[in-house]
């Protein structure tokens, strides 16, 4: 019988097709494995990412875990059980009422709080100023422009004072000095809202004497305070005692209101900063984001006062300008103190990444994107 040779044209064609198929399978396998490697090496770990989406869903889940907030809430509940015994009797009822309301809002995470900040923050200020009680022109509107002035020593390297004072609302942090001849050309002279960490409030109020020395910018400047310790509702009651925030009418003799940030805003800020910190950890160490807690004191980790002030301003202003955020090797940590070292409980580098996104690509910020919060961020500019 005659032997069939493989040199026949049809056989050669079959062989070429077979080789092509093998190469195609090999190439697809390579692409799949290289894709896995790219995901593992991606800045935010790659896991849980949707096509065309910069947000890592696994990091979103991890950011929701907040032991520090849980510890504060548990301590608050114990204070309620003990009827806030540390409060002087004349301030106890007011302090307890504020604490109960605050605890009652703790259980719900709601990025939609951004759309309520005009009502929660600006409306009480308008009422105090006599602008928001009768359906006037200013009722319900946002501030046209806001300047948030941080405390970084880099402020002294520029002269932004006049630019800062040109904004409708000027927000300052933790009673940093302003307005005198030494700092005015750098930080401005006007203040429309003081943002205080409640630790600062606790240091300048004296409950036993019923005295409040926390109004560094004058009795007519409202205070917005974040409660980092539920016991500080006593100091809040003392400082808010003379304000007219509950009367609904302006009073020339009354001090401006002391407003407590809504716990939903606190939780939103905490998740945003932890997300950016987790992402930074995974990118810089190459380790799984789940190991983040080993490198940080998770029970102490917290966002900075400045970060929350910026987010709050984004909720009540049509345009936000930010000054004095950042660092330089030659500058002090705070422009008005000798402190040079940053606080370990904050991840400032992660916050700087958030600020860069806020300025240049706000759509990439988890929790604050319009589809998450129903809120559109205003333009935010950082002056350095």
Swiss-Prot record:
InterPro entries: Glyco_trans_29, GT29-like_sf
Principal cellular location given in the protein's record: Golgi
Protein name: Sialyltransferase-like protein 3
Segments on the Lumenal face: 27-384
Family: Belongs to the glycosyltransferase 29 family.
GO molecular function annotations of the record: sialyltransferase activity
Signal sequence, renumbered to the chain: none
Membrane association type: Single-pass type II membrane protein
GO cellular component: Golgi membrane
GO terms (BP aspect): protein glycosylation
Residues annotated as transmembrane: 6-26
Cytoplasmic side: 1-5
Domain of life: Eukaryota
Glycosylation site list: 241
Protein task: Possesses sialyltransferase-like activity in vitro. Transfers sialic acid to the glycoprotein asialofetuin. The transferred sialic acid is linked to galactose of Gal-beta-1,3-GalNAc through alpha-2,6-linkage.
Cellular localization per UniProt: Golgi apparatus membrane
Keyword Transmembrane helix attributed: yes
UniProt entry tagged with the keyword Oxidoreductase: no
Lineage: Eukaryota, Viridiplantae, Streptophyta, Embryophyta, Tracheophyta
EC number: 2.4.99.-
A family per Pfam: Glyco_transf_29
Keywords carried by this UniProt record: Glycoprotein, Glycosyltransferase, Golgi apparatus, Membrane, Signal-anchor, Transferase, Transmembrane, Transmembrane helix
């Amino acid at each position: 019988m005659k032997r069939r040779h493989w040199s026949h044209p049809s056989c050669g064609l079959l062989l070429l097709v077979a080789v092509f198929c093998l190469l195609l399978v090999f190439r697809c396998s390579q692409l799949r494995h290289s894709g896995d490697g790219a995901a593992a090496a991606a800045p935010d770990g790659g896991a849980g990412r949707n096509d065309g989406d910069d947000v890592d869903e696994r990091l979103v889940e991890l950011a929701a875990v907040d032991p520090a907030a849980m510890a504060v809430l548990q301590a608050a509940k114990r204070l309620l059980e003990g009827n806030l015994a540390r409060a002087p009797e004349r301030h106890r009822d007011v302090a307890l009422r504020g604490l109960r309301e605050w605890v009652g809002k703790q259980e719900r995470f709601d990025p939609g709080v951004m759309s309520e900040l005009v009502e929660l923050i600006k409306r009480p200020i308008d009422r105090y100023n006599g602008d928001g009680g009768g359906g006037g022109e200013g009722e319900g509107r946002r501030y046209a422009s806001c300047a948030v002035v941080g405390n970084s020593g880099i402020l002294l390297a520029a002269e932004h004072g006049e630019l800062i004072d040109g904004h409708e609302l000027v927000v300052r942090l933790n009673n940093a000095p302003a307005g005198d001849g030494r700092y005015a050309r750098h930080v401005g002279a006007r203040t429309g809202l003081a943002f205080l960490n409640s630790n600062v409030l606790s240091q300048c109020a004296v409950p036993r004497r019923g005295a409040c020395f926390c109004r560094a910018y004058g009795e007519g400047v409202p205070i917005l305070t974040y409660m980092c310790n539920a016991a500080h509702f006593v100091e809040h009651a003392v400082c808010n005692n003379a304000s007219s925030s509950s009367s609904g009418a302006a009073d020339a003799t009354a001090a401006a209101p002391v407003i407590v940030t809504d716990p939903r805003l606190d939780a939103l800020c905490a998740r945003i900063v932890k997300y950016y910190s987790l992402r930074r950890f995974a990118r810089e160490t190459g380790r799984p984001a789940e190991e983040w807690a080993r490198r940080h004191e998770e029970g102490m980790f917290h966002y900075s006062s400045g970060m929350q002030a910026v987010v709050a301003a984004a909720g009540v202003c049509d345009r936000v300008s930010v000054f004095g955020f950042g660092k330089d090797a030659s500058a002090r940590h705070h422009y008005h103190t000798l402190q040079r070292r940053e606080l370990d409980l904050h991840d400032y580098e992660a916050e700087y990444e958030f600020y860069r996104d806020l300025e240049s690509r706000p759509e990439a910020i988890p929790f604050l994107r319009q589809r998450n919060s129903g809120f559109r961020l205003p333009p935010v500019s950082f002056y350095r």
